């Protein structure tokens, strides 16, 4: 039978529930358990696919093509399980399914209510996502007390009642502030958030206290007394330099022993050797490189979370401190294409994105990298930008652009593809008037790499599988012209469309761009060959 750990948060948002939950999962996995994770989002959006990065941060794409919360990226980076669409759902999806059942007559004319119909659907989805695992860690988005979260909290209350204390555990993350003016740690916010939980029938078994300093024994005893939680189950979650220090930090306080005792799990001792090696590599780099990330969401770096982490993973595997400088592509445009801020950079990266804002600034950055032999990595839109720049400045295709930015451009080298084959062999179609939500090329797709290409050398194979999230493709009608001008198409999709997947420049020290998102499959234990190769190229450029 699957055991459930429910992780909730109180006082304020953005305390790090996802990291805490993922760290617990990593510890339990190191003890030999088969662990999965679920994220329950209270918003009414069906998924975050159409939400602004400034509102939501990064959209993480699962292997099977679900657009999900960035916390699922943390889950995959901390444990070995691959997330799917079953590992994430929102209020919007729950209501959508319940209403569809009502329309079909599944409820036999009954009045459809939050209890039991909505809560039953939530429980069904939790059990579905947890099936086949020893332990499922379920993170409830939002903050206890929010009206949006109430159906989810009621659902897990019912699960505790139905499954019992030895099969369920509540871990609550709270904020314990230090008031500098008074020189005191304040426990009252934590007392109040637990009071809020108790009012809806939830008693925390573990309290994880988010703090910027070690918790004194007196405060620990006080919280235990007022919150009715064992003193040893008051666990500190302190500020650290790297999120990968968190599993060891929580383990050292015995959190996994508390969990295994309550859930009656007879398992081996934790082995965090791999995590200790990762932390040691992060703390003791032998080299340093500076990489410019040129994008338009740079004011909220959470928009590029997986990408930032993938570069850090590459640093772990090359003993390098990867220092990222975020460059606003709009500022380059406003300053007439001035890219002087790139001159001290060892490499340049242009990430994915949508819309025309800041595009010409990105094109200027690509031009600088190409003309000055600076290692360049383009991802998704970053590949399309590189291709547009090459078409304009090398292939002589004046007016080259993407129809995403200029529907009537003279040379649409990037355009909306209206039909393509999915990974399971079915055919999907779209046009300019199609809904934005769920209409992109999503999830893992097979890619064929050209023998002898830089792509094949990086991956060590001519057949790879990478995740996608995009609506526009390279226009194959222009490929012959671009190839004649020296551009190398190093990879194409395995389907009948032969869509361009990677491009490279043979006469450049290291110039590579891909349509897919390799950052979604990078983790600190293994890294990713593309990012490792990119950081090595930056190191070589620095030495040169």
Swiss-Prot record:
**Which reactions does this protein catalyse?**
UTP + L-glutamine + ATP + H2O = CTP + L-glutamate + ADP + phosphate + 2 H(+); L-glutamine + H2O = L-glutamate + NH4(+); UTP + NH4(+) + ATP = CTP + ADP + phosphate + 2 H(+)
Q: How is its activity regulated?
A: Allosterically activated by GTP, when glutamine is the substrate; GTP has no effect on the reaction when ammonia is the substrate. The allosteric effector GTP functions by stabilizing the protein conformation that binds the tetrahedral intermediate(s) formed during glutamine hydrolysis. Inhibited by the product CTP, via allosteric rather than competitive inhibition.
Give UniProt keywords alphabetically: ATP-binding, Glutamine amidotransferase, Ligase, Magnesium, Metal-binding, Nucleotide-binding, Pyrimidine biosynthesis
Q: Does the keyword Glycosyltransferase apply?
A: no
Amino acids binding UTP: 13, 186-191, 222
- Supply one GO CC term from the record: cytosol
Q: Give the pathway listed in the UniProt entry for this protein.
A: Pyrimidine metabolism; CTP biosynthesis via de novo pathway; CTP from UDP: step 2/2
**Where is Mg(2+) bound in this sequence?**
71, 139
Q: Tell me, what is one Gene Ontology molecular-function annotation carried by this entry?
A: glutaminase activity
Q: Which sites bind ATP?
A: 14-19, 71
Assigned EC number? 6.3.4.2
Any idea which positions bind CTP?
A: 13, 146-148, 186-191, 222
The residues that hold L-glutamine are: 353, 381-384, 404, 471
The organism sits in which domain of life?
Bacteria
**SUPFAM superfamilies linked:** Class I glutamine amidotransferase-like, P-loop containing nucleoside triphosphate hydrolases
Per the database record, which ranges form the Glutamine amidotransferase type-1 domain?
A: 290-544
Its GO biological process terms? 'de novo' CTP biosynthetic process; pyrimidine nucleobase biosynthetic process
Instruction: Indicate the segments annotated as coiled coil, or none if absent.
Output: none
The UniProt entry annotates the active site at 380 (nucleophile), 517, 519
Fill in the misc note: CTPSs have evolved a hybrid strategy for distinguishing between UTP and CTP. The overlapping regions of the product feedback inhibitory and substrate sites recognize a common feature in both compounds, the triphosphate moiety. To differentiate isosteric substrate and product pyrimidine rings, an additional pocket far from the expected kinase/ligase catalytic site, specifically recognizes the cytosine and ribose portions of the product inhibitor.
HAMAP family recorded: PyrG
Job of this protein: Catalyzes the ATP-dependent amination of UTP to CTP with either L-glutamine or ammonia as the source of nitrogen. Regulates intracellular CTP levels through interactions with the four ribonucleotide triphosphates.
Instruction: State the family it belongs to.
Output: Belongs to the CTP synthase family.
PANTHER family xref list = CTP SYNTHASE (PTHR11550), CTP SYNTHASE-RELATED (PTHR11550:SF0)
Q: What is this protein called?
A: CTP synthase
């Amino acid at each position: 039978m699957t055991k459930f750990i429910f992780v909730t948060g109180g006082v304020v948002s953005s305390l790090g529930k996802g990291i805490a939950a993922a760290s617990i999962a990593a510890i339990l996995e190191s003890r030999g358990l088969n662990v999965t994770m679920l994220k329950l989002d209270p918003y009414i959006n069906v998924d975050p696919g159409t939400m602004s990065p400034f509102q939501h941060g990064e959209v993480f794409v699962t292997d099977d093509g679900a657009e999900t919360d960035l916390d699922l990226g943390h889950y995959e980076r901390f444990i070995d399980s691959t997330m799917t669409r079953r590992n994430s759902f929102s209020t919007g999806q729950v209501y959508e399914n319940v209403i569809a059942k009502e329309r079909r007559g599944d409820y036999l004319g009954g009045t459809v209510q939050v209890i039991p119909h909505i809560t039953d659907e939530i429980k069904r989805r939790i059990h579905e996502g947890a099936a086949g695992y020893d332990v499922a860690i379920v993170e409830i988005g939002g903050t206890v007390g929010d009206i949006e979260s109430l159906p989810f909290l009621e659902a897990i209350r019912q699960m505790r009642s139905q499954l019992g204390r030895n099969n369920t555990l509540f871990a609550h993350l709270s904020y314990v502030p230090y008031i500098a003016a008074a020189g005191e740690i304040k426990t009252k916010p934590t007392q109040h958030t637990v009071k809020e939980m108790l009012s809806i029938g939830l008693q925390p078994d573990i309290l994880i206290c988010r703090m910027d300093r070690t918790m004194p024994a007196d405060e620990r005893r006080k919280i235990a007394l007022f919150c009715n939680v064992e003193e040893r189950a008051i666990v500190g979650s302190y500020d650290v330099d790297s999120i990968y220090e968190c599993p060891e930090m929580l383990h050292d306080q015995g959190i996994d022993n508390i969990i295994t005792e309550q859930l009656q799990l007879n398992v081996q001792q934790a082995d965090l050797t791999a995590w200790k090696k990762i932390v040691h590599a992060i703390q003791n780099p032998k080299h340093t490189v500076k990489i410019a990330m040129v994008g338009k969401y740079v004011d909220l770096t959470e928009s590029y979370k997986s990408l930032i982490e993938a570069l850090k993973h590459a640093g772990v595997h090359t003993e390098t401190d990867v220092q990222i400088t975020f460059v606003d592509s709009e500022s380059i445009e406003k300053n007439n294409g001035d890219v002087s801020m790139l001159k001290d950079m060892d490499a340049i990266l242009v990430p994915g994105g949508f819309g025309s804002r800041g595009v010409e600034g990105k094109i200027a950055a690509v031009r600088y990298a190409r003309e000055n032999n600076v290692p360049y990595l383009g991802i998704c839109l970053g590949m399309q930008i590189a291709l547009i720049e090459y078409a304009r400045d090398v292939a002589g295709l004046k007016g080259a652009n993407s129809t995403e930015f200029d529907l009537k451009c003279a040379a649409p080298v990037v355009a909306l593809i209206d039909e393509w084959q999915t990974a399971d062999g079915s055919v999907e179609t779209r046009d300019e008037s199609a809904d934005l939500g769920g209409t992109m090329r999503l999830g893992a797709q097979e890619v064929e790499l050209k023998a002898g290409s830089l792509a094949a050398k990086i991956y060590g194979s001519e057949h790879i599988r990478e995740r996608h999230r995009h609506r526009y493709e390279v226009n194959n009608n222009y490929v012959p012209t671009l190839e004649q001008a020296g551009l190398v198409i190093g990879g194409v999709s395995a389907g009948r469309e032969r869509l361009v997947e990677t491009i490279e420049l043979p006469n450049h020290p290291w110039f590579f761009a891909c349509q897919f998102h390799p950052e979604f499959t990078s983790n600190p234990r293994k890294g990713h060959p593309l990012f490792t190769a990119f950081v090595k190229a930056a190191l070589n450029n620095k030495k040169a």
